[in-house]
Design a protein with these regions (language model features):
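Structured alpha-helical
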Residues: 1-438, 476-493, 499-534, 642-644, ...
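Flexible, substrate/cofactor-facing loop regions flanked by secondary structure
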Residues: 397-408, 542-602
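Glycine-rich acyl-CoA binding loop
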Residues: 451, 460-479, 641-646
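Bilobed periplasmic-binding protein-like "clamshell/Venus-flytrap" ligand-binding domains
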Residues: 656-663
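Extended hydrophobic-aromatic, low-complexity segments
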Residues: 205, 309, 526, 568, ...
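C-terminal intrinsically disordered extensions
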Residues: 523-558, 697
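Conserved donor-binding loop and adjoining core beta-sheet/short helix segment
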Residues: 417-464, 602-640
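Conserved active-site beta-strand-loop modules that form the wall/rim of enzyme catalytic pockets
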Residues: 181-184, 193, 286-287, 297, ...
Length: 721
């Protein structure tokens, strides 16, 4: 429509016209019932005087404009003059099909009738960007509509800085320091919004200060599509229902924590684009992608078709690649910047995306950066077995455990690597089907993912460190993955042996540099291979083994807080209200896998002595079986004899289908002080994903430094087990 309460006040458009009383499309009272409205009073009569410099629109083009309005069920405005008071008014009318000789329009049912005695001045078409004036020569009029002679030409009065779009079905809430008003969004441009709102119960517009910013929240259904502070541009004078024009305060903001080193952005070839249904206008939108990374993308909008506003959330956006592949996600506009060559560059952050789709996007981008990189795509498992044996990742001891289950093991990995993106992802470095580097990551606990199976070997003719390339790409994968709610990742964990210099330099180095175990922690465990016994010794009097409960959590947390202050309890969900394994168990079961765990408390005279976490998984899911054994946290190392602990362990091993299982015992000194032998030690490295940006920046700095002695010094011990 043409009114005085639009974003044109912000842009000072000289072609702007106005009406009093707000939008004539307002056809519902506070009760929500349909009502006929009086025509709005037109105040700026001089604005319809056509200047000599106004561009002309010829009859043929006018005919096409009229027919397009009819095709889209659009409307135009009729500029009338009341003969009694010489006042100009505007009313809605809907154009009918036009042959080029005459224009016939039907009155809007929202308007009062009785315009037969008014003087017809102009037809006005507002396409959101410009106002077109059509001179009128009346041929016929009645209570249903009218017909005018098609003029030789119309005129364009002016052009707005930003196109305005009418909106329907978008709920608006305006808040300011306790004041609340609710209503609807009438229209918007890339510069501003126009809303019609009324105060909530017991509120008053007297409380609304237009000199201070207010927060505008827009809903499409139950979903928020915009919520940000805005400044006031204009408002109507009514104190019951107001039309208010608001301009967003921000042209850019950071959705995620800042990074020193961003993930690489690439230009995709063949070309790619995004498509979505605009959340405010409900129309299909397509934009070409300028560049893209795993965490976001940017597009270019022309001056006269800008529809992206910083802060706007698009819940169903599709990335189209090469005309065939479609990747769906939720995205948010985070900046809008004018380009020197014209148009506006808009950045969008990816807020959420399912794991399978994220893997496809990562693989596309990884291949652009390095054609040897493969991320979460189908893998030749025969090449994978060969790689694991060649790199000594499956050594003689591990193979002895796997040999009797090798057929199951092969099928397990085919399924895991091809059909289970919710649970696992992998990065490989390949050439001609041969694998030279590998790392994978799997969802090990309710909100914790475990990095494992990190191995590499030199690629013939390539002097760069393959392991560093794989690790670097895993970090790029992490960069976007950690932001996705659907990933269910609050913590990432990684086991490595203290003598393994490669991870100790990178992962352990970060812990030492941070010096804050609530950001990233290292806990040292003793590893012991424990034989499963068929017979069980009962616990002595006053000793008890029972399922872990909230009553035991205080003693556990107190012990761990005074020994480590790290993240172990949070990552393994050993807090006061453990959520358990039921959700993750079902996800694994859906994909044909086993994954579950239970926690038990070993007490003496009601005093906690140890917590035992019974982990179960398919054999070989982790090649070191770190998810198919028992973790033990000894809370009273001096008050727990080894023979008592073994009696408790023996009561829990009946769930395993193997002859022996790994024990991981914390603190690592317990076995040594109890004169019990063990094979090795493992660090459990854990990071709180809230601080993933710090780790990614640290690691990318480390992996981009050309270490002269990296190959010579680290590679020999790359994954010593």
């Amino acid at each position: 429509m043409i009114d005085s309460d639009t974003e044109d006040r912000c842009s000072h458009d000289s072609s702007h016209t106005g009406t009093e009383g707000g939008n004539s499309t307002q056809a519902r009272g506070e009760t929500g019932e349909k009502a006929l409205l009086p025509p709005p009073l037109f105040k700026h009569r001089d604005l319809t005087r056509i200047p000599k410099s106004a561009p002309r629109i010829e009859k043929r083009k006018l005919t096409n404009i009229i027919n397009h309005l009819n095709f889209t069920d659009g409307y135009l405005w009729v500029h009338l003059r009341d003969p009694r008071y010489e006042e100009d008014i505007f009313v809605h009318a809907y154009p009918q099909p036009c042959t080029g000789e005459a224009i016939t329009c039907r009155w809007s049912q929202e308007n009062l009738t009785g315009f037969e005695y008014h003087r017809f001045l102009n037809l006005v078409i507002d396409d959101g960007m410009a106002v077109t004036l059509i001179p009128v020569k009346l041929l016929h009029i009645n209570r249903e509509g009218f017909t005018i002679q098609m003029p030789d030409a119309g005129h364009v009065l002016g052009k707005r800085e930003a196109r305005r779009y009418a909106c329907q079905g978008v709920t608006a809430e305006l808040t300011q320091s306790g004041f609340l008003a609710r209503g609807t969004l009438l229209d918007f441009s890339s510069l501003s919004f126009r809303v019609r709102v009324a105060p909530a119960l017991e509120g008053s517009f007297h409380w609304l200060n237009p000199d201070e910013p207010a927060t505008l929240t827009l809903y499409q259904g139950q979903k928020i599509v915009f919520s940000d502070p805005c400044r006031f541009i204009d408002q109507t004078s009514s104190m019951s229902v107001k039309e208010i024009v608001l301009a967003p305060q921000k042209t850019k903001f950071h959705r995620f924590r800042g990074r020193e080193i961003r993930s690489p952005r690439v230009n995709l070839a063949p070309s790619s684009s995004v498509t979505f249904v605009h959340p405010l206008v409900g129309k299909d939108i397509q934009r070409d992608i300028i560049d893209i990374s795993v965490s976001g993308l940017s597009v270019l909008e022309n001056m006269d078709e800008c529809v992206l506003i910083p802060g706007m959330i698009i819940h169903h956006l599709t990335i189209r690649y090469s005309g065939a592949l479609k990747l769906s996600c939720t995205a948010q506009v985070v900046y809008r910047r004018k380009e020197k060559k014209g148009g506006f560059r808009c950045g969008l952050a990816i807020l959420d995306m399912d794991a399978s789709t994220y893997g496809k996007l990562s693989n596309i981008l990884g291949n652009v950066l390095d054609p040897h990189l493969h991320i979460s795509d189908e893998i030749d498992t025969e090449a994978l077995w060969k790689f694991f044996f060649e790199t000594d990742f499956i050594n003689s001891k591990k193979y002895a455990l796997l040999e009797s289950h090798k057929d199951k093991f092969k099928e397990l990995y085919r399924n895991l690597y091809r059909n289970s993106p919710e649970l696992s992802t992998h990065v490989t470095y390949q050439r001609n089907g041969n694998i030279y580097g590998h790392v994978s990551m799997m969802r090990a606990y309710h909100r914790a993912w475990m990095v494992h199976h990190l191995a590499a070997k030199p690629m013939p003719g390539n002097t760069s460190h393959t392991g560093l390339k794989v690790l670097h790409q895993l970090l790029n994968y992490f960069d976007g993955f950690t932001h996705l709610p659907s990933a269910k990742m609050d913590y990432a964990m990684f086991y490595f042996r203290p003598e393994n210099r490669f991870p100790n330099f990178f992962f352990g180095g970060f812990v030492r540099d941070m010096h804050n175990p609530e950001i990233c922690s290292l806990d040292l465990f003793a590893y012991k291979n424990y034989g499963v016994k068929s017979s069980q010794n009962p616990l002595p009097d006053k000793w008890s083994l029972k399922e872990f409960s909230a009553a035991d959590s205080y003693s556990l947390e107190q012990f761990y807080r005074n020994h480590s202050k790290g993240l172990l309890l949070r990552a393994l969900d050993l807090g006061s209200k453990p959520s358990g394994d039921s959700e993750l168990k079902e996800v694994y079961k859906k994909h044909g896998f086993k994954r579950q765990w239970k926690m038990f408390s070993l007490t003496h005279a009601q005093e906690l002595k140890a917590v035992l976490i019974v982990d179960q998984s398919d054999i070989g899911l982790n090649l070191s079986e770190l998810l198919n054994g028992i973790k033990i946290i000894v809370t009273d190392p001096h008050g727990l004899p080894w023979d008592i602990l073994t009696s408790a362990i023996d009561q829990l091993t009946s769930v395993y289908e193997v002859d022996s299982i790994p024990l991981l015992v914390y603190p690592h000194t317990y076995l040594e002080n109890s004169n019990v032998s063990y094979e090795k030690q493992y660090y459990m490295w854990i990071i709180d994903i809230q601080y993933a940006a710090k780790f990614l920046d640290y690691m990318k700095k480390k992996t981009t430094i050309k270490l002269r002695y990296a190959l010579k010094f680290f590679f020999k011990r790359f994954l010593k087990k």
